[in-house]
Amino acid sequence: MKIALLHTAESNISIFQKAASEIGLPQGALHHEVRADLLAAAEKAGGLTQEIARETGAALLELARNADAVVLACSTLGPAIAEVENAIEVPVLRVDAALAKKAVKSGGLVVAICAVETTRAPTTRLFTEAAQSTGAQVEIRLVPGAWELFKTGDRAGYLAAIAEAAEAAYDDGATIVALAQASMAGAADLVANGPKPLSSPTAGLAAAVELLSMRS
């Protein structure tokens, strides 16, 4: 089994390797490709443009040539899957799609935490659509200043800010908190009140494995 991942941050590779180990994937099961330029372009443009979506789609197509499944690990670029999903023979997934499905499953108030402004719109659409079948109430919260901490290399400060936002969401009555960006996964262990927040790396990889097992 080989799962190819398209990242926009080098630091996310170790996060997904940890998630792979947690769900029992063997060493070498993941192949990583990092395209930081795609997220940088989206941030500069104020969101995902058609041109950036095409570039993302081309990268996904290339990864699919030597993989059993492809996972797009960037929430901002997520909608770009629509460019190629019908042209790729292997499963291609948004890492946050499985997260959204899991988060809304039991209904209640679901708070999805974002750090990047360009992620807010695609995350809102994704979680709102997922909630239609369960009746969950969805709220998207952007954490001011968090992404600047990430980009300057202050990982500890970044995760602390995300954890603080998650705890605030629970204080405000959230049933479950979803950490919408893969880079946030480490913050789940820092949250002291409420259920452990859900994160996308484990959910996304588990969904890919499930799809592959259904096809075999």
Q: Language-model segments: which ranges?
A:
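Non-catalytic structural scaffold of enzyme domains
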Residues: 1-216
